[in-house]
Amino acid sequence: MQAIKCVVVGDGAVGKTCLLISYTTNAFPGEYIPTVFDNYSANVMVDSKPVNLGLWDTAGQEDYDRLRPLSYPQTDVFLICFSLVSPASYENVRAKWFPEVRHHCPSTPIILVGTKLDLRDDKDTIEKLKEKKLAPITYPQGLALAKDIDSVKYLECSALTQRGLKTVFDEAIRAVLCPQPTRQQKRPCSLL
């Protein structure tokens, strides 16, 4: 059985841990708990192929900037996450996460993931953003960013409702099993 290492990165509180817990346990966790990182392992079938999917959670907080890259070697695919209701986390994909991942892993495939899809149409959330002269991130904005960072795919999901959740991980596996030729041939990350 092929083993695939998938590392999840993004700003603190965008829902990385909830994404992983909801996917692996089919249950949405309670309160927000910042993570250093937890590893999950799941045997899954994608396109009739059995895969051992190793899921690596990371801490988005700046305190962990020096520690986080220790989980990057031998990564097969990255999920760079941002919250659809946090424009700052969206901007940080370009400003921080993409450069960090590419610095350590120049040719590992990336999937861009917009989280908290259930809140994009939530009246209270929209109102809070409007008070700060902000708005939720739209699907076309997500697609444009994915193109800018040469992401294999752009996907949106909700860990709460599980809408689009399984697709995120299926596509992460497909990005490794059926690599798309890009400007550079993709290969697992290694630190020299």
Curated annotation (Swiss-Prot):
Description of activity control: Regulated by guanine nucleotide exchange factors (GEFs) which promote the exchange of bound GDP for free GTP, GTPase activating proteins (GAPs) which increase the GTP hydrolysis activity, and GDP dissociation inhibitors which inhibit the dissociation of the nucleotide from the GTPase.
Catalytic activity: GTP + H2O = GDP + phosphate + H(+)
Top-rank lineage group of the source organism: Eukaryota
Residues bearing PTM Cysteine methyl ester: C189
EC number: 3.6.5.2
GO MF annotation list: GTP binding; GTPase activity; protein kinase regulator activity
S-geranylgeranyl cysteine: lipidated positions: C189
Motif (Effector region): 32-40
Keywords in alphabetical order: Acetylation, Cytoplasm, GTP-binding, Hydrolase, Lipoprotein, Membrane, Methylation, Nucleotide-binding, Prenylation
Modified residue annotations for N6-acetyllysine: K147
Subcellular location(s) per record: Cytoplasm; Membrane
Record's subunit section: Interacts with DOCK2, which may activate it. Interacts with S100A8 and calprotectin (S100A8/9). Found in a complex with SH3RF1, MAP3K7/TAK1, MAP2K7/MKK7, MAPK8IP1/JIP1, MAPK8/JNK1 and MAPK9/JNK2. Interacts with PAK1. Component of the phagocyte NADPH oxidase complex composed of an obligatory core heterodimer formed by the membrane proteins CYBA and CYBB and the cytosolic regulatory subunits NCF1/p47-phox, NCF2/p67-phox, NCF4/p40-phox and the small GTPase RAC1 or RAC2.
Function: Plasma membrane-associated small GTPase which cycles between an active GTP-bound and inactive GDP-bound state. In its active state, binds to a variety of effector proteins to regulate cellular responses, such as secretory processes, phagocytose of apoptotic cells and epithelial cell polarization. Regulatory subunit of the phagocyte NADPH oxidase complex that mediates the transfer of electrons from cytosolic NADPH to O2 to produce the superoxide anion (O2(-)).
Protein name: Ras-related C3 botulinum toxin substrate 2
